[in-house]
Amino acid sequence: MNLSNELKLGLALVLIALTAILSLWMLHRATDPKTCKNKVKGMLKRFAALRQYKVLSDVTVQYEGKKAHFDQILVGVYGISFVSCLADSAAYYGQEREEKGTKVDSKTGKKSYFANPITAGEKAIDLVRRVFSKNNVYGIQMEHLIVFAGSPRKTEIFVKGSIPMLRRSDLKKLLDKVRYEEDRGVDVEKIVKLLQDHAE
């Protein structure tokens, strides 16, 4: 084998190694919970920016000694969407009224439990209603969205509930619906300030 062929072989091996490293990095990034949560946040922020809506991230509302955490809150003239984000790439199992659900990690196969996002969301939104009531804010349409934000190919959903169980792509389709453009007279700035005033 002459020097030219050795050089070509060496370059080919380097390219193969770089391709493998890049593929592994992209796979890790696609299944990283922080990256997955940020994708949902980015989707909501882009949607909000075009409409002068607001997005609050990682908010813990407190009132009368109780706390309610929200991954994302979208506030618009239509009302408020409280978003719970389950960011792990896993298979999720659960029933609407069970206290906990089960998830099986797609990489390790390890089984763990997570708090039922449906009942947790109901309690959290009830606390926000009490904050609004104390401040004479009524008639705001509020919804709770659960987004399974993990890698689409590595996430399976077997959770039964009366509210939608969304993947990231489902969230985008949902936000395209006309109801998110309807002006129901919500004062976006006032609601955002009220939530921030009661946040940790």
Regions found by a protein language model. Give the residues of each.
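Surface-exposed interaction regions that form or flank ligand-binding interfaces
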Residues: 1-68, 74-96, 101-200
